[in-house]
């Protein structure tokens, strides 16, 4: 059985036991988290939401709060001796999918 959930403005296909990385959620490590925005449930019985599946939830456990790899943002204006260098690390949350309730 699998489901498609929406979190952080993205749609993610998940299965039970899978580890996923999502945009940062405001929860502590080791806590349980429930996704209510389930768009699709597949498997033996297919359920398609309009826009979400009524009564369907996905339960997950928070493994880690972290930050991604650093990217460098470099901007310059030619012939003007003007340049700017910045770095950015995107925060993320690592989850393990425990159960899909449909």
From Swiss-Prot:
This protein binds to 23S rRNA in the presence of protein L20. One of its GO terms (molecular function) is rRNA binding. Residues 79-91 have a biased composition (Basic residues). Keywords: Ribonucleoprotein, Ribosomal protein, RNA-binding, rRNA-binding. Belongs to the bacterial ribosomal protein bL21 family. One of its GO terms (cellular component) is ribonucleoprotein complex. This is Large ribosomal subunit protein bL21. Residues 79-102 are annotated as: Disordered. One of its GO terms (biological process) is translation. Part of the 50S ribosomal subunit. Contacts protein L20. InterPro entries: bL21-like, bL21-like_sf, Ribosomal_bL21.
């Amino acid at each position: 059985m699998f489901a498609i959930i929406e979190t952080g403005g993205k749609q993610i296909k998940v299965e039970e036991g899978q580890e996923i990385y999502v945009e940062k959620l405001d929860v502590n490590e080791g806590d349980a988290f429930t996704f209510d925005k389930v768009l699709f449930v597949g498997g033996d019985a297919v359920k398609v939401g309009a826009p979400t599946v009524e009564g369907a939830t996905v339960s997950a456990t928070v493994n880690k709060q972290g930050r991604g790899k650093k990217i460098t943002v470099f901007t310059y204006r030619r012939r003007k001796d003007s340049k700017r260098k910045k770095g950015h690390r995107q925060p993320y949350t690592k989850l393990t999918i425990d159960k899909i309730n449909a």
